Amino acid sequence: TAQREQALLLLADQQRRWGHLQEVILQPWRPDGEAARQLSEPEQSDLLNTIVMARQLLPAQVHLQTPPNLWPLDQLPAALEAGINDLGGIDTVDVINPAYPQPAPETLRQLLAPLGWRLEPRTCVHRQWWPLLPAALRQRVEQCARLLASAPA
């Protein structure tokens, strides 16, 4: 829609101006209290179009995230092909959408590996942004990243 395009253009402008936009989360909107339900095909199509638009309008260093628990798993590859490059915190409870359980990381690995995608743990700050962190915080984030890298898959 025109409103989404305008919002994405504003975000792109802010990124070019200030350079501090780490990610944009693209997910279906659900009213508070609505029972859990699968995305309809029109909702999926609308969200995929928004992802494509976001990837075209936002600078490449801005990650696009979608929570995999809000997609039908068999349609998640389409979101990745459209431009998603971050699945967020998949190993935790979704505190924003608690009615939607997170898929197991192994389930996601099995789905994505044959398509050439790799599931990788990361800190809440993307690596490209570490140089902007204060030294003490950067050291802590690097320590957390080493722990994540050494954890069993």
Indicate residue ranges for each PLM-predicted region.
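Auxiliary Fe-S-binding modules of radical SAM enzymes
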Residues: 2-153
